[in-house]
Every structure is written in structure tokens, then in C-alpha cells.
């Protein structure tokens, strides 16, 4: 089958997928969630977690969900403003990490790889864009995923056609211009994941969101998920728009922690996970759509995903732990020092890590368990104050 024929099949599949899009359950008909346990039974001290929740509640931070997993078990699951486990949230750039995992699945099948030249692949599927892709022939998949493509794109705040009501997002993305040699300069721009998501769809011969459902979301037992923001062609963006429950975000963290394995099954090649979580030549804190040593200081190994306004999946390998947060926190500051990032750094460094690494083995007690239960109940009844303006996509859904 030619690439152009594959693209025609892909467009047809996109229409079909769009007609049945919506929240989904696991193949067995019910979500397969991680087990929940009393923190002390997993060697975790609940007292710092109670203090963390009290701080968030006292300062009325708009933290919608905060989940801590230790050794594959949920030890802390906090929701605000009446929200529950069933709610999903706009993940913003955490979506990019999912796209990298999908590329890894295709790498394991020999359909994509770090050195794949993306422009020729797209041009063969979209001949109408060949002229715009002519200056991008040397850009490889790894350059796009490490934000070192060398492309330059100027975003029009609030009205950019890459984000808002795009009739054909890919057509907008390819108008970016090659400004630096690929692999030499880090520049965090959102045309990169649009190109990667397109490559994933072409290589998989189904739309990216359908491939994600088949090869990642259903095997991990996701529920109540949605990939929003499709453009006029029906294609989702590879860098934003995915909505997941916090407990399903935690499963992504566990997949990364366990080198691509889930319940004994290799979902993503282990070698790909290692590449994702290894710094690229262009940035010592960024791999394949994965931040590295970005949250925790003092040399503690850590990597994960970060999204605008305070969406996080953080993996702590030494503690065999995963931390997840969804929020609407202040966005002032830069990519590496945003207020939401600094607040999250304090949460992890001052409260969560001490809970995971107590000075002495914690003792399970009825009093400690009740104190945690009471604080979580108070948190669910507390409405946080948004730290930044809420957009149309920021409302939690079910």
C-alpha cells in the first residue's frame, strides 16, 4: 500500500473514530484501578501528607487532584471542590509524553524510530504540503521529541490557528521555518508534537487517538478519558488536548517507572523508555517529551511530564513512587521557573518525599488513618481559588 493510500484510509478512519469518540471503559467493562492502601502499610508516613493537604486547603490553592503511588499502590488520593476519582482533566503538555510513548510502541514494531526523517514521511502522505516541508528534510523524530528541531514559530497569543478552531492544524505547523541545525538548540514550541502526532498516525495507519485507545489506554484499563481539540480534518494535536483521570495519569507514571511494562506485559520497549528519560544533547533536563531532574533538588533521581497551569506526572525511581497533580495554579514565570512549578516543587520536596522516606518505619494506627480520612473529606468540601484565568477546557469532566 502506498503512503498516499494509507493517508486516505487514515482520513476515513478518523471520521469513523470521531463518530464513536467519548469516554471509554477498559476492555473488561470496568476500570482497572491501582489498589488503595493505608499509607503506613506501605511504609509511608501519612503525617506529612496531612500537613500538605492542610497547607493547600488553608491557602485555597486550586489543586483539583493530588495522588501519590508507592510500590504500585495508591497511598494518598486527594480531591478538591467535590471532585471524585471519576473526573478527568485537561493535561495540556502532559499529552506530549503520551505521544512519545505511542511513538515508542511504533519503534518496537519497526514502523518509526528516533532517526526517522519526518518531513518526507508527511510529504508522501500529504503531497499538498511538500513545498512547505522542503526546508525540513533533515529533521528526525528525535529532534522533534527533544524540542531541538531547529524550527521557529511565532505564537499569536489567544488567536493562534495552531490551537483555536484550526481547520487543518498540520498545514499551520508546516509553515514554521528551519532556523537552526536540528539537534543543536532547545526551543519549546508546539509545532513539534503536531508533526510527531502526524507521524504516529501515518505509521500506525489509524488516527493517533484511536491508536492510543487500542495500544495504551485499554491495556492499562483507563476510564472516562477523552482527547479533545480535534481540528477540521478530525486529527487531534500530539501536544495537548488529552483528558485523563488522575488515577490513570498515575498508571502512566507506573509504566515509565517499570520500563514500559504493565501487569507483566511489555507495552512500550524498555529501551525506548530509557531514551525518553535520558537528557538530549540540546538540554540536560529534557529527553523525549520528558522532563528530567526538573522537580526535585539535592540529587534525587526524578523524571516525568509537566503541563501548563500545573499538571504533573512525576516518577521517583529510588522511592518506587509516582506523584500526580492536576491544578489551576499561577502561570507567571518561565518554562523552568513558573509559579505552578515552584509550588509543586515545594509540595514534593517538603512534604511528599519526607512521607516516602520517614526516619523510622511508620506505625499504622487508627488515629493516623482517621486524621488522614478527615483531612481528605475537608479537602473535598473546599473550593480552591484559581491561580490563573480558567479557559473553556479547564473545567473537570466525567
Question: Where are each of the predicted segments found?
Answer:
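A short, well-structured edge-of-sheet supersecondary motif
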Residues: 53-84, 313-314, 320-324
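Active-site SXXK
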Residues: 72, 89-118, 144, 196-200, ...
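Active-site-proximal alpha-helical segments within enzyme catalytic domains
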Residues: 192-199, 240-261, 311-328
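Short, charged, amphipathic alpha-helices and their helix-cap/turn boundaries
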Residues: 47, 73-78, 117-120, 157-182, ...
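Active-site Gly/Thr loop motif
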Residues: 274-326, 330
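Short, gly/Ser/Thr-rich active-site loops of penicillin-recognizing serine hydrolases
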Residues: 334-398
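Active-site helix/loop module of the DD-peptidase/beta-lactamase fold
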Residues: 90, 109-151, 175, 204-240
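Bacterial N-terminal signal peptides
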Residues: 11-21
Amino acid at each position: 500500500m502506498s503512503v498516499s493510500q494509507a493517508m486516505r484510509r487514515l482520513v476515513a478512519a478518523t471520521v469513523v473514530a470521531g463518530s464513536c469518540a467519548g469516554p471509554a471503559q477498559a476492555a473488561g467493562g470496568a476500570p482497572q484501578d491501582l489498589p488503595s492502601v493505608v499509607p503506613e502499610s506501605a511504609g509511608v508516613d501519612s503525617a506529612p501528607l496531612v500537613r500538605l493537604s492542610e497547607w493547600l486547603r488553608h491557602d485555597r490553592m486550586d489543586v483539583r487532584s493530588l495522588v501519590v503511588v508507592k510500590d504500585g499502590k495508591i497511598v494518598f488520593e486527594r480531591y478538591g471542590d467535590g471532585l471524585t476519582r471519576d473526573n478527568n482533566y485537561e493535561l495540556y503538555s502532559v499529552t506530549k509524553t503520551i505521544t512519545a510513548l505511542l511513538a515508542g510502541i511504533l519503534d518496537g514494531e519497526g514502523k518509526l524510530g528516533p532517526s526517522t526523517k519526518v518531513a518526507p514521511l508527511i510529504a508522501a502522505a500529504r503531497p499538498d504540503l511538500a513545498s512547505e516541508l522542503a526546508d525540513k528534510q533533515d529533521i528526525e523524530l528525535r529532534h522533534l521529541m527533544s524540542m531541538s528541531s531547529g524550527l521557529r514559530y511565532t505564537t499569536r497569543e489567544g488567536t493562534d490557528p495552531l490551537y483555536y478552531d484550526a481547520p487543518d492544524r498540520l498545514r499551520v505547523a508546516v509553515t514554521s521555518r528551519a532556523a537552526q541545525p536540528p539537534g543543536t538548540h532547545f526551543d519549546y514550541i508546539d509545532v513539534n508534537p503536531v508533526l510527531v502526532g502526524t507521524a504516529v498516525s501515518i505509521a500506525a495507519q489509524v488516527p493517533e487517538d484511536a491508536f492510543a485507545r487500542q495500544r495504551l489506554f485499554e491495556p492499562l484499563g483507563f476510564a472516562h478519558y477523552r482527547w479533545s481539540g480535534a481540528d477540521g480534518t478530525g486529527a487531534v494535536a500530539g501536544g495537548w488536548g488529552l483528558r485523563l483521570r488522575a488515577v490513570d495519569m498515575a498508571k502512566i507514571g507506573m509504566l515509565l517507572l517499570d520500563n514500559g511494562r504493565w501487569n507483566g506485559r511489555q507495552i512500550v520497549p524498555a529501551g525506548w523508555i530509557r531514551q525518553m528519560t535520558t537528557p538530549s544533547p540540546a538540554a540536560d533536563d529534557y529527553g523525549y517529551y520528558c522532563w528530567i531532574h526538573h522537580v526535585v533538588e539535592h540529587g534525587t533521581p526524578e523524571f516525568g511530564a509537566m503541563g501548563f497551569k500545573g499538571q504533573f506526572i512525576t516518577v521517583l525511581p529510588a522511592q518506587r513512587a509516582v506523584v500526580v497533580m492536576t491544578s489551576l495554579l499561577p502561570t507567571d514565570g518561565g518554562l523552568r521557573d513558573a509559579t505552578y512549578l515552584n509550588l509543586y516543587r515545594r509540595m514534593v520536596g517538603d512534604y511528599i518525599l519526607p512521607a516516602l522516606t520517614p526516619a523510622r518505619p511508620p506505625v499504622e494506627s487508627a488515629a493516623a488513618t482517621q486524621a488522614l480520612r478527615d483531612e481528605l473529606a475537608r479537602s473535598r468540601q473546599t473550593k480552591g481559588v484559581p491561580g490563573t484565568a480558567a479557559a473553556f477546557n479547564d473545567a473537570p469532566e466525567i
